[in-house]
Amino acid sequence: MSTGAQTKAAEASQHADGPRLLADVGGTNARFALETGPGEITQIRVYPGAEYPTLTDAIRRYLKDVKIGRVNHAAIAIANPVDGDQVRMTNHNWSFSIEATRRALGFDTLLVVNDFTALAMALPGLTDAQRVQIGAGARRQNSVIGLMGPGTGLGVSGLIPADDRWIALGSEGGHATFAPMDEREDLVLQYARRKYPHVSFERVCAGPGMEIIYRALAARDKKRIAANVVTADIVERAHAGDALALEAVECFCGILGTFAGNLAVTLGALGGIYIGGGVVPKLGELFMRSPFRARFEAKGRFEAYLANIPTYLITAEYPAFLGVSAILAEQLSNRTGGASSAVFERIRQMRDALTPAERRVADLALNHPRSIINDPIVDIARKADVSQPTVIRFCRSLGCQGLSDFKLKLATGLTGTIPMSHSQVHLGDTATDFGAKVLDNTVSAILQLREHLNFEHVEQAIDILNNARRIEFYGLGNSNIVAQDAHYKFFRFGIPTIAYGDLYMQAASAALLGKGDVIVAVSKSGRAPELLRVLDVAMQAGAKVIAITSSNTPLAKRATVALETDHIEMRESQLSMISRILHLVMIDILAVGVAIRRASPNAELAEAMARAKARAGASAGDEAADVLDWLSHGAAPAAKE
């Protein structure tokens, strides 16, 4: 299966990290495929879900059948809502944890999305040969697209254009309450209510819904129907000309048309409504001759509006694979930075020019970069099946000085491209979900700080601190923790330091400061009027103020030097979690900077440090270099005996 790319072109653009597993899991069957390169989908196989106790068992069977080795990345479109780590299928008995499944199968990535979200992402790429228009109407470019499809359930989704990409909507719109449009549908509703307290559109216009319609009409006509009659039998009888089956199909298509019209006006889907799922394609000409389109347009005052919106039947054989492939590709691109990650792009560009042995090292770096970063050269050589000198030659072929230099560049390529976004924690999130969100939010905030921090101001602050006669750290509430941490670090430099978290003590101490003294004020809001008045007193006496705060705050504007740590916090009323981490990081940066200044070979400074340490009872040999090692997250200085 190809999306239009020529075979030779596809062969030239195979996924560097190996084939990707794609899956389309419905209530009845699980379909699997391998994507060897962009748009090149092969080895499509279908497995009845009832034959496998778990989804993991079905995936393992498929991987065994196609004789594939390791798969690094996989994406699953599933006929079920996906909200968090736990998935419990509505129309099947499979229940699983996404993360536990990923670990059990040894995947680096396992993405699970709603099947109609995946199908929606396939719509912009469909060709005329992969869809059939029903009725009139012309789609408007760059407009919202609606998607629906009866299968075991009634799937619903939509696509919203956003610049040069599309955003898929996750929806459970099939569970909207069914509203009959005529007496026959009233009868169907009354029949369905005997079994279901809430009759949704899914109950009457998904696959099993045709059975309800058929039996309701049979009960009206006082006809006996065998208990084992299913939708496939009804469709077969309709194609054979059976009057009751034909009426059931007609009623089914009419209800589907009403639902499609509801979806179109709800979304404003001027880009068209697409119909997927497994039921409608089996109706063939019965659907084309049905009242579907007439009922789609039957919206009274909005009839003309709907008449201009086209409706399409998707005829592509496995369209969900196209969509889930696109979602997985975007996810991986966001994670690795795509072409923006220079080191990975360099490896790909150079690969064909390398020797066969060096290519094996290149493939290891592309497919398992963290192994390269963390492993010693002997393990890297063993995993790539090359000699250790070959590993070094590979690094130098890329313009690196050696393995250490290459590891550093590779690590930067990985860690420097984490998406800078903020994820909201929701009630009901599992530990896996909210733990990952807290960590991701913190990492993203630190990376944003690295990108936007004014390092010229950092240098100025370090110079001020290094030459200070006395340093006082002020922080109120949560910021007092940061002030205490700073005091603990800076007093080791032999500079008189203290931390105050009480406004009265801050005011009393600030009144004693003067020229040569420094206050480091830590505040998320930067607006506390009492703190600002204290700082004004100190600055009027000649003291300098370094502010660690948000930009454009009164504190930032007053300070001698402002180190701005802007970020997204969940709620103003909450305990400031991310700001505390960023403020602690800023203290680390300042402390390391001062330690570097004081570890330099300056005789006068070294003598002053020695005198300070002697007064503190420490050995003069315990130099600032030891403190630097400790501050920069090396080993803490050993205690002197």
Swiss-Prot record:
SUPFAM superfamilies: Actin-like ATPase domain (SSF53067), Homeodomain-like (SSF46689), SIS domain (SSF53697)
Residue ranges occupied by any SIS domain in the UniProt entry: 461-600
TM ranges: 576-596
Compartment list: Membrane
EC number of this enzyme: 2.7.1.2
Keywords: ATP-binding, DNA-binding, Glycolysis, Kinase, Membrane, Multifunctional enzyme, Nucleotide-binding, Transcription, Transcription regulation, Transferase, Transmembrane, Transmembrane helix
Region (Putative HTH-type transcriptional regulator): 341-641
Glucokinase: annotated segments: 1-340
Binding site for ATP: A23, D24, V25, G26, G27, T28
DNA-binding region location: 377-396
Example GO molecular function: glucokinase activity
Limits of the HTH rpiR-type domain: 341-417
EC primary class: transferase
Gene3D superfamilies xref list: 3.30.420.40, 3.40.367.20, Glucose-6-phosphate isomerase like protein, domain 1, Winged helix-like DNA-binding domain superfamily/Winged helix DNA-binding domain
Region span, Disordered: 1-21
A GO cellular component entry from the record: cytosol
Reactions that this protein is recorded to catalyse: D-glucose + ATP = D-glucose 6-phosphate + ADP + H(+)
Protein family per UniProt: In the N-terminal section; belongs to the bacterial glucokinase family.
PANTHER family to which the protein is assigned, alphabetical: GLUCOKINASE
NCBIfam families assigned to the protein according to its UniProt record, in alphabetical order: glk, PRK00292.1-3, PRK14101.1
Name under which the protein is recorded: Bifunctional protein glk
Organism: Burkholderia thailandensis (strain ATCC 700388 / DSM 13276 / CCUG 48851 / CIP 106301 / E264)
